[in-house]
């Protein structure tokens, strides 16, 4: 009887327990893919470091050899290749060399002879590219005779004083051209007339029977009656000019020099394709005498390249023969082709 009473009570209690369990809220699980937030410090914005382009100071004579540099400037090519260029006008080669020696110019158009003289004790300058090189029909240096002299051939210059700037590329080219024409060393006579205006005036008056001039001044003299006796268009190995930089500048800023030369390369292509487009620069930069504006034919400019070791050694032998140098100056250390585009 007692057992029969307990079973109904047990069943009632069990039913109440199950009901209460069913009504309890279920536990919430954190999904495995839900990120757990953590405290982070606020981000600090950073600014990109802007490096200013290197500025190269170029000493420039008023000569046609510099024309590609002005084309590069006019076309914005120096900026395109990440370099600033400042032109420093000079009136003479000695002034140019003084600025380079003092570190007031970084580079210039010059000749291998000038680099040799800088480098006779220690390497200070390196030629990195041809600037202008004679080609067929486009001479760089001209041996001219006065119209009053009657001289028309190299043979006529035997024993005749020829006005030059002594100890320079002009004297070097003069001797090499006449030697190539068959004259011997004792038949070649030069006289120092260092200033080009004086040389031109003496030629015109007949006081000087012969003299050597670079183009376009040679073209002007011919227009005034001078006679072309010889020029270096058939001997480009003698009369070329180069672009040179101080070695300290090259060592410190090789990428800037590479950018400069890349700009010159593109400017050269533009100039050779359409020289007439840049006629304004001939007058603006005083590269051509006023009487020749509109008449002077701009020569083709060389593509990337540097003087050969044979060209270097020939000029070196000449300089040593003149007593300008007493030591061999290293070609490998003085001519640098690694920066060309």
What are these regions (language model features)?
Residues 34-184, 190-193, 209-215, 228-231, ...:
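Short, glycine-/small- and polar/acidic-enriched structural segments
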Residues 317-341:
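Conserved C-terminal helix/tail region of periplasmic/extracytoplasmic solute-binding proteins
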Residues 23-33:
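Bacterial lipoprotein signal-peptidase II cleavage site
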Residues 2-10:
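Bacterial N-terminal signal peptides that target proteins for export
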Residues 80, 134-136, 302-309, 331:
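Short, solvent-exposed loop/beta-turn-alpha elements that line the ligand-binding surface or hinge
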Residues 113, 122, 190-191, 195-281:
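Pocket-lining segment of extracytoplasmic ligand-binding domains
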Residues 251-326:
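Secondary-structure end/capping motifs
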């Amino acid at each position: 009887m007692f057992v029969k009473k307990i079973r109904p009570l047990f069943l009632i209690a069990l039913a109440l327990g199950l009901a209460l369990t069913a009504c309890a809220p279920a536990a919430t699980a954190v999904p495995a893919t839900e990120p757990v937030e953590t405290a982070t410090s606020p981000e600090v914005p950073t600014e990109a470091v802007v490096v200013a382009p290197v500025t190269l100071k170029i000493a420039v004579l008023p000569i046609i050899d510099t024309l590609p540099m002005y084309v590069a400037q006019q076309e914005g090519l120096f900026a395109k290749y990440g370099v600033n260029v400042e032109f420093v006008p000079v009136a003479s080669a000695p002034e140019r060399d003084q600025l380079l020696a003092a570190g007031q110019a970084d580079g210039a158009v010059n000749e291998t002879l000038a680099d040799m003289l800088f480098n006779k004790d220690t390497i200070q300058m390196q030629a990195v590219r041809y600037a202008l090189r004679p080609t067929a029909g486009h001479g760089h240096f001209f041996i001219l005779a006065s119209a009053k002299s009657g001289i028309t051939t190299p043979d006529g210059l035997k024993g005749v004083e020829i006005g030059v700037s002594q100890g320079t590329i002009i004297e070097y080219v003069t001797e090499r051209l006449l030697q190539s024409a068959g004259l011997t060393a004792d038949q070649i006579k030069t006289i120092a007339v260092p200033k080009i205006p004086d040389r031109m005036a003496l030629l015109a008056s007949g006081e000087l029977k012969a003299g050597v001039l670079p183009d376009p001044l040679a073209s002007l003299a011919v227009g005034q009656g001078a006679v072309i006796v010889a020029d270096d268009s058939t001997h480009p190995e003698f009369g070329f000019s180069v672009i040179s930089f101080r070695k300290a500048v090259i060592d410190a800023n090789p990428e800037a020099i590479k950018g400069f030369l890349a700009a010159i390369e593109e400017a050269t292509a533009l100039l050779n394709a359409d020289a007439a487009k840049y006629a304004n620069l001939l007058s603006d930069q005083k590269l051509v005498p006023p009487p020749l504006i509109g008449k002077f034919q701009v020569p083709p400019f060389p593509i990337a390249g540097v003087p050969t070791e044979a060209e270097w050694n020939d000029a070196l032998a000449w300089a040593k023969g003149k007593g300008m140098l007493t030591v061999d100056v290293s070609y490998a250390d003085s001519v640098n082709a690694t920066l060309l585009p």
